[in-house]
Amino acid sequence: MMNATENQIFVETVSDQELEMLIGGADRGWIKTLTKDCPNVISSICAGTIITACKNCA
């Protein structure tokens, strides 16, 4: 049994497109990222008819 101080590593297979979407490298992203198009941007989730990722480059 693992205690709270032990680290866990999870590996999941994703496509290049899914990875780019996650990190925001090509378009929008779901997590804090440093990208060529928008450095130091924290992505946010926007509500609408469909939940989408939004990047604010301001």
Swiss-Prot record:
It is found in: Secreted. GO terms for cellular component: extracellular region. Maturation of macedovicin involves the enzymatic dehydration of Thr-33 and Thr-35 into dehydrobutyrine residues, that can form a beta-methyllanthionine bond with Cys-38 and Cys-57, respectively. This is followed by membrane translocation and cleavage of the modified precursor. The modification 2,3-didehydrobutyrine is found at T33, T35. There is a cross-link at T33-C38, T35-C57 (Beta-methyllanthionine (Thr-Cys)). Disulfide bonds join C46-C54. Keywords: Antibiotic, Antimicrobial, Bacteriocin, Disulfide bond, Lantibiotic, Secreted, Thioether bond. One of its GO terms (molecular function) is signaling receptor binding. GO terms for biological process: defense response to bacterium; killing of cells of another organism. Residues 1-25 form a propeptide. Lanthionine-containing peptide antibiotic (lantibiotic) active on Gram-positive bacteria. Macedovicin inhibits a broad spectrum of lactic acid bacteria, several food spoilage species (e.g. Clostridium spp.) and oral streptococci. The bactericidal activity of lantibiotics is based on depolarization of energized bacterial cytoplasmic membranes, initiated by the formation of aqueous transmembrane pores. Belongs to the type A lantibiotic family. This is Lantibiotic macedovicin. The lineage of its organism: Bacteria, Bacillati, Bacillota, Bacilli, Lactobacillales.
